[in-house]
Amino acid sequence: DIKSSNKVINAWCMYDWANSVYSLVITTAIFPIYYNAVTTSSTGSYIVSFFGIEIVNSVLYSYSLSFSFLLLTVIQPILSGIADYSGNKKLFLRLFMYLGSASCMSLYFFDGNNVEFGIICSVFASIGFTGSLVFYNAFLPEISSEKDFDKISARGYSFGYVGSVILLIICLIIIQKFDVFGFPDSQSATKFTFLLVGIWWISFSQLTLYYLPQKNKGIKITLDVLTYGTKELIKVWNYIKNFKNLKLYLFSYFFYSMGVQTIMLIASYFGDKELNLDQSKLI
């Protein structure tokens, strides 16, 4: 029985181990600092050109992340409909995983002279990461009983924290001791860590893809399938409208979550521009 199979459950948790390095290394700890450093001119100017538009580097990066989140808000109901209605969850998990990891590795070629390329790669990495999570989470009912959802989800989170911290430590050692590893400067070492993130993500995801079940229902992706997720969201909204406390909780959690994520995403810029912290302290 696939459900409650420890091997399958651990394989599912390994995707958290694989993809959480994106959250920690790319969105939080290293890439924002690198981006800010390479897009700041020698005179200290923060202005960059993005397809001919002059804009402050941190504002551009914030807008790009906002755009990726807005786009994901639109497509997530569609993705969830595909995940619930069809049996192609593994295929879409694989596609979004490769999109995200390849985008992370492509950041190796971003050096500040090709701002458009770096921003586009970071947007695709965000889409790949979040899109893959839709199909990853959709596997949970297939591999576990409902009573074990919380326990297995917690195990996945713990795998993610451990895996991402391990790679972050490796990346920091490479950056701080770049000469020991044969890099000419810390910038080259930092770019190499983006390659490591993509390789880590792809490599450990193979365990997940190998052991997770494939249940192809043979259902074609029609308009009904694409709108299924949106219809379900409307049903849920009509249901929770009758529960005042639940509505208050969800709205409160929304603003709390957005606040925490905003701090995580822009803390490095605040530390650099407002507090003038050294890059090593920012990391």
Enumerate the language-model features and the residues they cover.
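Glycine-rich segments within core transmembrane alpha-helices of 12-TM secondary carriers
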Residues: 153-175
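C-terminal ends and interior cores of transmembrane alpha-helices
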Residues: 73, 94-113
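Cytoplasmic helix-loop-helix junction between adjacent transmembrane helices
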Residues: 121, 125-158
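C-terminal membrane-cytosol helix-exit motif in multi-pass small-molecule transporters
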Residues: 167-180, 198-218
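Short amphipathic helix-loop junctions that connect adjacent transmembrane helices
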Residues: 24-58, 265-282
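Juxtamembrane intracellular "pre-TM" segments in multi-pass secondary transporters
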Residues: 1-10, 213-251, 274
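Cytoplasmic membrane-interface "Motif A"-like loop-to-helix N-cap segments
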Residues: 83-99
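Central cavity-lining transmembrane alpha-helices of secondary-active solute carriers
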Residues: 26, 30, 55-81, 102, ...
